[in-house]
Amino acid sequence: MYWDLLSPLGSRTLGASAEAKRLAGEFSRSALVFGTNNETVLRLAAGPQIVPIYGTDFRSTPVFFLQDDHDYFENDEATDEIVTFPPSAFMLQLARATQRLYYPEFLPDATRPIGLPWASSGDRDAGLSESFGTLRFGRLAEVLLYDVRRTMTLAGASAVFIDLEVERWLRDRTEASDTTHLVHAPSNPPGWSAGKWGEWYPDVLGADGKLTTREPKPYWQAGWLAQHDRLMTSLANMRDRVPLVVSGDLHAIAMGRMLRCGRLNLEAKPIAAVLSGPIGTRPGGWPSARRGIGATPPTHIDLHGEVAPIEQHGFTVADFRPDSIDLRFFKWDLKTEETDLIDSMEPFHDVRLPRRG
C-alpha cells in the first residue's frame, strides 16, 4: 500500500498531500492508533487499497502477505535530513495495525522458533509471527517468507536486514533435508537492483544511466551485503534441491541465474532469482519511470538472464513436483489488452528447474 508520510520523494504526492488529507485526514504521531482518530485515518487510507483487490478479486485465492517499506507508511530513503528505516515507533504501530485489520499473521510452525522477533507478541496469540513465515506443503515444499525492514539495523559492517536469530532459523531450515524443495522469498529481491538505498547492494544510478559502485551510496550498510552473501551461500550449498529465491518489490517479471555472488563461484550450481511480477502498478510506479532504471543485476552479481525484466502486470505460477520446480510466467499489458483476456492468458515463458543429484 502507498501512503508515505515523511519520505522526501513520496510523501508530497501520497500521505502528506492535500488530496490525502482531504480523503482520510491527518495522523497524530504522538497518539495511539486503535481507539483514536488515527484508526479512522488508517482505515480510510489502507482499506480502499487492500479490500477491493485482496478481499474481492482474490476472495477465492489464498494470499499471504509480506510487509515492505511502504507498508510501514514510508519509502526507503536516506538523506542528511531523514533516514526512514529502521521503522520508528509510529511506523511500527501503523504497520502492525494494518496487518491486524486486513491480512493475517503467519501461523505457528514446529520448525520456526516461537521466540523470533515479532512472534508471540503480547497482543497476538502464541506462535503467530508477524514478519517471518512458513508455507509448508507436507514433505514436498517449504517456502520461507521474511520481511527485511522490521529488524534492519544501521551498524556498518555488522548491520543486518534480518535479525541474527531469524537468519539462524533461515539457514537451519535451508540446511535441513526434511522437504524435497525449499524456496526463499524475502521482501527485497536478491539478484536485482534499482539503485535504491534500502537494497542488499551498494549500487547507485550513475550519470550514464547505469548502476555503479564507483559512487558512494550514502547511509548504505556493508553488513546488509554480508548477510545477503551468507544466505545465498546457504542456498548454493543445498544438496539435491533447486536453489530458488522469489521476490516482488521491483514491479517486474524476470528470471535470471546467479553465476557469481561476490567471490562465490556459482557456475556449477547457479541460484535461480525470480521477480514474480506485480498484479497492479499505477502508471508512474514502474521503477524505470520513477527512478530512471528498471530492475537490473547489481555489480556484485553475475546473472545469466533468462527472462529480461518486463515492467508489465503479471504473475508467476510454480508447480512443485518430486523431481523439479516448473515455473510459468504470465504478463498482461494494461495499455493494449482488454481485462477479459486475463481469464484465458497463456504463459509467455516456462522453465523447468530439475533437482540436483
Where are these regions (language model features)?
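Metal-dependent phosphoester/phosphodiester hydrolase catalytic core
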Residues: 1-357
